[in-house]
Amino acid sequence: MERNEKIENKIKELSAEFLSREGNKTSLINVAHATCSPDMKRATIYITVLPIDKEKTALEFAKRKRGELRGFIKKNMPVKIIPFLDIAIDLGEKNRQKIDELLRNS
């Protein structure tokens, strides 16, 4: 496993821990995966939210907590530079769920 992939996995793991601890209990925020730019200056954390109607609120919450999340990652990950974090809804997972629903209903 290359360095970039290890860092992405660790960011995913720590983000999931942080969001489950800090999140409200009205929705479930799942960290689907994380990606880092080749220069390791930016990372995007992809999340899914249940129930779906809480998605916008959960995304806003996660984006507000980016600074705290970055500090948590910095404290728990042994690398010199922590990438700037962005958070987005995992559209691939969302599309997969729509396809599954369409297949069930046909």
Q: What are the language-model segments listed below?
A:
Residues 1-106:
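Charge-rich, low-complexity N-terminal segments
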